Amino acid sequence: MEPVSAECHLPPEDDLLEMMMEQSFTEPEEKSQDKPTRKIIPKTKLCKGVNNRYCVLHIKEVYAQREEKHLTITASQEGDDLELCILKDDWVALQIKPGDIIHLEGNCSVDNTWTISRDTGYLILYPDLLISGTSIANGIRCLRRSVLSEKFKVCDKGSRQMLNGTMLHDIFQRATTCGFTDSVLQELAHHTVHGPKYLKEMYQLKLNQADVMGEIQEYLPSLSKWATDFMTHPLNQQQINRTKSTAGDPTETTKVSEFLDIEENIWSPRFGLKGKIDVTARVKIHQKSKAHLKIMPLELKTGKESNSIEHRSQVVLYTLLSQERREDPEAGLLLYLKTGNMYTVPGNRLDRRELLKIRNELSYYLTNVLHKSDNGSKETTLASLPAMIADRQACKYCSQMRNCALYNRSVEQQTENCYIPPEMIPVVQKETEHLTEDHLQYFRLWYLMCTLEANSKDSKMGRKNIWMMSSSEREEDGQCIGNLIRTGHVQTISDVQYLHSFQRRSGSVPATNLASGDRVVVSGEERFLALSTGYIKEVKDENITCILDRSLVKLPEDLLFRLDHEEGGGGLEFHLGNLSRLMENSSVSEKLRKLIIDFSKPNFVQHLSSILPPDAKDIVASILRGLNKPQKQAMKRVLLSKDYTLIVGMPGTGKTTTICTLVRILYACGFSVLLTSYTHSAVDNILLKLKKFQVGFLRLGRTQKLHPDVQEFSEEEICKAKSIKSLSALEELYNSQPVVATTCMGVNHPIFTRRRFDFCIVDEASQISQPICLGPLFFADRFVLVGDHQQLPPLVKSAEARELGMSESLFKRLERNQEAVVQLTVQYRMNSKIMALSNKLVYEGRLECASDRVSNAVVQLPHIKTLLLELEFRESQESMWIKDVLEPSNPVCFLNTEKIPALETEEKGGISNWIEAKLVFHLTKLYLKAGCRPSDIGIIAPYRQQLKMISNYFNSLSASAVEVNTVDKYQGRDKSVIIVSFVRSNIDGKLGDLLKDWRRLNVALTRAKHKLIMLGCVPTLNRFDCLEQLICNLKTENQIYDLPEGAHEHFPV
């Protein structure tokens, strides 16, 4: 009988739509040998070899004696050089589709056929998604929990048992170098419990150091006993016990002869795994009068000696991870510290196969998170998670129970084929009964938008580039520095901080985007992926210094290293964690839901006298005297608020000063304040002003990310200076200051489990996405959002997420309640003519200059007369416009490049305009010659390729202080002179998206204090609605200068 086949192609509405063939494959009988179109192949590197990557082009289900799946695959980017992968036995159940990337283990036959069956080979689905052994082991009993734990990482709270386990791991690992005698173990335990390393965790869990020490000491005799029984150290020449084996020879004995590594961090793109091996040991195995040495992973467990499938599975997975660094150990060791009993866990094929299948299933659900509707609308919805298990008892103690029920009720129950085990229906109902349909819809929409955004970022960059691209390729993008050798001594800063210095094997350190404070992954150039992670301390021409979590001193001296920027995933876990918290059944979350989702009106008290303490009135009155009228109104509104206030900080209105003054007043009234923003620099700008007024504050965050003048107030520096090692001292520090400052993503700090604030102030609130902005609001009774939704919105890269509303900030959302809004309209930055531009375009005339001095201010050019005299001698008819542009009394100039002409060019790196770049360069040279300081000039362009081109011109000029940057980088800042290059100039009607955003234009127009020069092609820019209005206003004011043909070539030198 002929086998029956069922074809599977990439669905026309799938996520890979743009990468699939323009028309479907025909039936296999008609076109079985045709070369599939390469449009199905995603933009990822494909290759053969040990770390092969194949793209699945076509899937055929074959029903013969046994069901099989035949995958047509290629390792060619062109879609040729086809191979066949046959899935047999239970591998047939693998969920896979055309366009998926796979890795194959096994042997390929001479006819280019792979066979993956019960007995041969492995298939790794999405191998570049590295999944931890813990997640896979937890997925054995409930795959849904593993998926949710990956998504809602910040919701997995620590526990006393987990902390004890971590500390015991630490003690054991230290003992591998110090010894396992009773006295040494006691000393290590004391050092661990009473040292600074775990103080935060003990504070968070409200533990007592003496109690913790007592619990830790219960384990110490077992550690000593294990060393006596199983180590071959000269101090432990006792009888060797047999390890218990989960399978194998009962006469086998095992003894540890050497500890090679602790917490060995391994990434395995070969098996799609990652993990930290507790201990890597050289082991001597005696079997039937024979002895042999092996390097094996040793997994430590502090809980009940269960020898459970989850525990054994982790060890089996570590045997696979170990193959990234050395030969297959074929087995691993599982040690229970409570009893001192150790098991040998063989890494047999059966266990490895089943665990990799679970890993594939987990990777499928973590990758295929979105679903395109089949109704022709191409609407994106959230995909279902693995099914719920029918075990109420297990679910009762699950840390993801709330998220499990929440996702089911808000997402899965909206689909037709949603199934819930009958016994779980009341559980889901109980966990979510406090939520209304509006609440569930808010959660569903924001979960979808955050997922769309995370996926759009992952498609452009990601961790996989570290192993899929060479260091030279990554260097071109500024994301890596390769060919490095380690130099000098490794300095130990703390238990998990080691200062390393690297230099280029030949030549100086290349130009790079890597900067101080950036997170990096250190790998070997040819082997040893992800040896260590850490942060850059300093980048110089001759060397680069890093603080890493591991010492690299034991590695070969001639090993070449590469440092890769570890790009964040966009903070998806923070977004989802805050969304989950908002849905909690708690009074804090309920209040925020009412204000944010239900739009309950904010409440205010009527009289300040009920708020201001009598002894603070004179101080507050003194502070208020230095403010203008709108700023005073803002102070009053905040003090009267019971829920929230929005302060609209229009350009140049002294937003930072206003926040600083607000903190001073709240401080004087005895209120506690949580001060936050999205960026460290925004937080520190406020603190630098506060510092001058002797307002005490505690700054949370990694020291390397903080402004140098703020670092002395950081938790890290204070703990070092005071040598804080007790919980009482730490608690005193955390409660010592009424003002605590951190970023919005720093609120997972332990201090927030014990402290609540009277007010939370969020700066840059109009630029922060709603879920991130939510984070600090959970920890205060009232909040103040400061921003301006007429300036830059939250950055959203996904067009679909933007259309759904992800660029709406919490500031913008709450602005509908106008009684909570105060506008700062008096500005101190721009002269009147520059201010008039945004006043007409955006602010409807509400902006006003603070004084005549501000209104009439012009750029200071001490050498302008000398320069103008020089120009008169060299002047030609073609360059007369230059004098007008230099004239300080002309604050606004638009240089129309239409007649030159100055057409844009589009290359691989992006869009640029070399003529505009040249004009910007020459204009800047003239301003410098006229006496303008380089630091007073700023250059703005919407496209990075244009910035790169302009910067290349400036490399030949000693004017490195002239800042060249995007609009986004200039938000909140100003310069005396701003030159804007609009770049776009074409005849085919191309527009692009960057210049369509009037908020971005508003920021560009409001950065200049005294002189604003814009360059662009009027006919092209007129096609943008917002720019058309600008050009119309400029024409009315006679501020447009038509540059003559070849103007860029007639510059006076």
Curated annotation (Swiss-Prot):
[4Fe-4S] cluster binds at residues 142, 395, 398, 404. Residues 522-1053 are annotated as: Helicase activity. Residues 86-521 are annotated as: Nuclease activity. Its cofactor is [4Fe-4S] cluster. It comes from the Eukaryota. It catalyses: ATP + H2O = ADP + phosphate + H(+). Disulfide bonds: none annotated. It is an enzyme of class 3 (hydrolase). GO terms for molecular function: 4 iron, 4 sulfur cluster binding; 5'-3' DNA helicase activity; 5'-flap endonuclease activity; ATP binding; ATP hydrolysis activity; DNA binding; metal ion binding; nuclease activity. It holds the Pfam family AAA_11. Key enzyme involved in DNA replication and DNA repair in nucleus and mitochondrion. Involved in Okazaki fragments processing by cleaving long flaps that escape fen1: flaps that are longer than 27 nucleotides are coated by replication protein A complex (RPA), leading to recruit dna2 which cleaves the flap until it is too short to bind RPA and becomes a substrate for FEN1. Also involved in 5'-end resection of DNA during double-strand break (DSB) repair by mediating the cleavage of 5'-ssDNA, while the 3'-ssDNA cleavage is prevented by the presence of RPA. This is DNA replication ATP-dependent helicase/nuclease DNA2. It comes from Xenopus laevis.
